[in-house]
């Protein structure tokens, strides 16, 4: 089995996550990519979670084993995340996997992103947040958008609305240097069942 998932993570009850939820005007405070690669006949598995966040060490990124992430992360333990399979054509798993690995290798989390930069003077902005002029930095939702963009551009060229949505978000970043938020990413793509399984 070879699959790729996107996990939209709901915030919990602690004070920091409550503040983030209030500022983003969304329950979703984080989003991650999960790759599942299993060969059941030979007992081999390489299941990973790709995570960009401020508390993930010097570069603000971490590649977890899925089993560890599921056990250690409250939103997974409490089963409050929304998880979708990203539908890719048969035989294209490794193309997308390679893109994810290269992106993870070449980009770091934008540690200039702080709560006070969300919206204007901390006032919520549910769709976009101030981005980084350094093209080697990212946040979790921008990383996940880039994976979606890669899939749409390569395997969904004939889907006009999907391509329009991707172009709109890409242009917004180019023109205003603002990243899409996890909640807005969810709202834009959740109804595209051709992509989100």
Identify the residue ranges that each predicted region occupies.
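Activation targets extended, charge/polar-rich intrinsically disordered C-terminal tails
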Residues: 112-197
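A structural motif
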Residues: 72-76, 87-123
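Glycine-rich catalytic cores of cysteine/serine-nucleophile enzymes that process amide/ester linkages
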Residues: 8-88, 128-131
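Structural alpha-beta junctions
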Residues: 27-30, 106-107, 153
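Donor-binding and catalytic core of enzymes assembling or modifying cell-surface/extracellular glycoconjugates
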Residues: 1-28, 172-175, 181-192, 196-197
